Design a protein with these regions (language model features):
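Conserved catalytic phosphorylation-site environment of P-type ATPases
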Residues: 112
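Extended substrate/RNA-proximal surfaces in nucleic-acid metabolism proteins
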Residues: 104-105, 224
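Active-site loop/helix belt of alpha/beta enzymes
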Residues: 7, 41-49, 53-54, 58, ...
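A charged N-terminal "starter" segment
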Residues: 1-103, 109, 117, 164
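Short secondary-structure boundary segments
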Residues: 67, 108-109, 132, 233
Length: 258
């Protein structure tokens, strides 16, 4: 029986011109708002460095990744845009964050205190964006569960030494769904986020960078002031919006005869 090597069965081809088209379409929809290009997980398997360079050339203001290794890969490739790590960063890696000017997500008070202690130990400041959980149910200060406690926690983070709180963000759970319940849920998330932003601002800690929209959010609700929409503009053959997206990937198979 003749066997085929698994690694050669299929691959993805990326059309960088289509990627540019999609980014420009989202940028046009966002109006004057700058965009954060999400290139986590190797840009969803499509080449983080290659995609990030396209986004940078097209005017992205930020890049977002899932972990420190991904952020460092972009820095080593010569990308100088601000980078946000959406996931966890070990406190012991704070010196790298400071040295390479990488921003960490801050999603809980204990985590913030650990980052603060690590930064103070090396005599520096680490930049962080507060992560609000308005209904996604992942990491973040749980505004939907107990708004007052969550806001109090965020305010305490803002007062910690060694931290420079430069942003506030959240993630819409069902912005890509068109049912009445989903639209209502997305609106509730947006309202909670705006309340949190206002609470921080009124206490004297207005974040410089505010971002709550994902790709679906900015396409469906461009009228909502989101500050820095986060978008990933691959547009695969199976998942793309007729409003803007051109498929940027093509699957290729080599099949044995018969």
């Amino acid at each position: 029986m003749k066997t085929q090597p698994f690694e050669k069965h299929v691959w993805a081809e990326i059309d960088l011109d289509a990627l540019r088209h999609n980014f420009r379409a989202v940028k046009a929809r966002a109006g004057e708002m700058p965009l954060c290009a999400v290139v986590k997980a190797d840009s969803y398997g499509h080449g983080a460095v290659e995609c990030a360079k396209v986004f940078a050339e097209e005017g992205a203001a930020w890049l977002a990744v899932s972990c420190l290794a991904e952020a460092r890969q972009l820095r080593k490739a010569g990308l100088t845009l601000p980078i946000l790590i959406l996931g966890h960063v070990e406190p012991g890696r704070v010196p790298v964050l400071i040295q390479e000017d990488i921003t960490a997500a801050c999603y809980s008070l204990p985590q913030a205190k650990a980052l603060s202690e690590a930064a103070c130990t090396v005599g520096g400041k680490v930049k962080v964006h507060l992560k609000a959980d308005t209904g996604m149910g992942r990491i973040g200060f749980a505004l939907r569960t107990d708004f007052d406690a969550a806001l109090a926690g965020m305010l305490e983070v803002c007062r910690l030494p060694g931290l420079e709180v430069t942003g506030l963000f959240q993630h819409f759970a069902v912005a890509d769904e068109g049912s009445a319940d989903s639209v209502a849920y997305t609106s509730q998330q947006h309202e909670l986020f705006v309340r949190a932003y206002q609470g921080l601002a009124e206490a004297g800690f207005e974040p410089a960078v505010v971002h709550c929209d994902n790709s679906a959010g900015v396409m469906l609700h461009p009228d909502w002031p989101a500050g820095l929409p986060r978008t990933h503009c691959i547009g695969t053959p199976r998942h793309h919006s007729s409003t803007a997206s051109t498929p940027a990937t093509r699957c290729v198979w080599h099949l044995p005869p018969g």
